[in-house]
C-alpha cells in the first residue's frame, strides 16, 4: 500500500537528533495542554455506557454507584490512579452525572492551606462529588483536615491565633471525594486508606483506541476510513488524549491538502508532517534514543546526562519520554543508568551489539 498520496510541503521533515524543541511542542505528551481544555470537554463521554475502554473499572464503578443509589447513601470515596490522559477526570464527571449531583473540581497544588480546603468543603451540598486532581500534591495541613472530612463529614475550623485560638466544629453534608493521581506511590498511607474504592486506569489497546478515534471523528463531523483510524490509534501510545490530539492534527492536514475526508494516505502524510513515527515516537523520543545509542554506545547513562544531550530538563526526559520508551521496550532502567535495548537499536536502523538487552 502507498504510504502517502500527498506531496508534503517542504519535503519530509528531517529526523533531528538535537534537542532544539521543548517538550511542550510535542504532540505525544499525554498531559493536557492549556489550549485543549475546551476541545476536551466537548469530546468527553457523559455516562459509563458511553465511556470506551477500562471495562473492569467501569463494571466495578457501576456496582459501587448502583449499590449506593439503591441504599440511598453517598458512595464510598473513589481513588483513580494511572498515567495522564486515560480518563480520570472524565470518570469523575461521569460519577457525578450518574449520581445526578453537582461536581466541584480543584487540584492538589491549589490546596496549600487548610483554609483553602475548608472553603471548598463548606460550599458542598449533600451528595455532591468533590474532585481533587493530582491529590498526591495536596499540602499536609489540608490533607490532615481532609482525613476528618472523609471519615466523619466534619472539620474543625480554628478561629483566632495564639493562646486565644478556639476550634469550632463544622458539619459537612455527606459527599463523595474522587481523587486522581498519576503517582499513587506518593500518597500517604492514612489518605490512601480512607478511599473505599480504588481503581487503576490502564493503557488502551489499539481496538479500543480505534473506537475512540472514530467516536471523536463523528463528534467533529469528520469523515475517516477505518484503516486511517487504526493508523492514528496505533501511534497514540495507548492514550485517548493523544489519539484525539493526533486526530485533530490529521483533520487539519486533510482539510488543507485534501477534501477533508481522512484516508490512510492523509493520516500517514499528516503524521510524517507532525513528526510522529509508526510506533508513536516523536522527535524528542528519537533524540533520547540517538543520544543514548550513538552518543553513549547504548548506555548505561544517567538521566541528567541524557537531558543535557537533548537540550531538555531532566524532569522532561524522565516524565514525558522515558515512561513510554520503557513500556515500548526500548529503554531499560538499571542501577547504573538507562540502557538501550535491541528494539531501540533496530528502531534507529542499527544492528545491536552482541549481548544487548532483548537481543535473542
UniProtKB/Swiss-Prot annotation:
Name of the coding gene: ruvB
GO cellular component terms listed in the entry, alphabetical order: cytoplasm; Holliday junction resolvase complex
Alphabetized SUPFAM superfamilies for the sequence: P-loop containing nucleoside triphosphate hydrolases, Winged helix' DNA-binding domain
EC class (word): hydrolase
Gene Ontology MF terms in the entry: ATP binding; ATP hydrolysis activity; four-way junction DNA binding; four-way junction helicase activity
Keyword terms: ATP-binding, Cytoplasm, DNA damage, DNA recombination, DNA repair, DNA-binding, Hydrolase, Nucleotide-binding
One Pfam entry name: RuvB_N
Record field: catalytic activity: ATP + H2O = ADP + phosphate + H(+)
Region feature (Head domain (RuvB-H)): 278-360
Assigned protein family: Belongs to the RuvB family.
Residue ranges of the region described as Large ATPase domain (RuvB-L): 24-204
Sequence positions that bind DNA: 333, 338
Subunit field text: Homohexamer. Forms an RuvA(8)-RuvB(12)-Holliday junction (HJ) complex. HJ DNA is sandwiched between 2 RuvA tetramers; dsDNA enters through RuvA and exits via RuvB. An RuvB hexamer assembles on each DNA strand where it exits the tetramer. Each RuvB hexamer is contacted by two RuvA subunits (via domain III) on 2 adjacent RuvB subunits; this complex drives branch migration. In the full resolvosome a probable DNA-RuvA(4)-RuvB(12)-RuvC(2) complex forms which resolves the HJ.
Organism: Corynebacterium glutamicum (strain ATCC 13032 / DSM 20300 / JCM 1318 / BCRC 11384 / CCUG 27702 / LMG 3730 / NBRC 12168 / NCIMB 10025 / NRRL B-2784 / 534)
Protein name: Holliday junction branch migration complex subunit RuvB
Domains as described in the record: Has 3 domains, the large (RuvB-L) and small ATPase (RuvB-S) domains and the C-terminal head (RuvB-H) domain. The head domain binds DNA, while the ATPase domains jointly bind ATP, ADP or are empty depending on the state of the subunit in the translocation cycle. During a single DNA translocation step the structure of each domain remains the same, but their relative positions change.
Gene3D superfamilies named in the record: 1.10.8.60, P-loop containing nucleotide triphosphate hydrolases, Winged helix-like DNA-binding domain superfamily/Winged helix DNA-binding domain
Source organism phylogeny: Bacteria, Bacillati, Actinomycetota, Actinomycetes, Mycobacteriales
